From Swiss-Prot:
The keyword Cell membrane does not apply. This is Phi-buthitoxin-Hj1a. May increase intracellular calcium release through the activation of nuclear inositol 1,4,5-trisphosphate receptors (ITPR) of cardiomyocytes, thereby causing an increase in the contraction frequency of these cells. It is found in: Secreted. It comes from Hottentotta judaicus (Black scorpion).
Length: 64
């Protein structure tokens, strides 16, 4: 039973570390709801830098 707990904790640590690395790679990109300067800014796939009247934000792009 103790070895199962150790393996489980090791697996969780590996998953958390992998998620943290992907966040570091995306740090320069804007996230949904974050300000952006233009369409040239890096929004996630399926998002565009759109105006909300006051500023530009990464928002879902539902097509043309």
């Amino acid at each position: 039973m103790n070895s199962f707990v150790v393996v489980l904790l090791l697996f969780i640590a590996i998953l958390c570390n992998a998620e943290q690395e992907s966040d570091e790679n995306a740090r320069s990109c804007n996230r949904l709801g974050k300000k952006c300067n233009s369409d040239g800014d890096c929004c996630r796939y399926g998002e565009r830098c759109l105006s909300s009247g006051v500023g530009y934000y990464c928002k879902p792009d539902f097509g043309p």
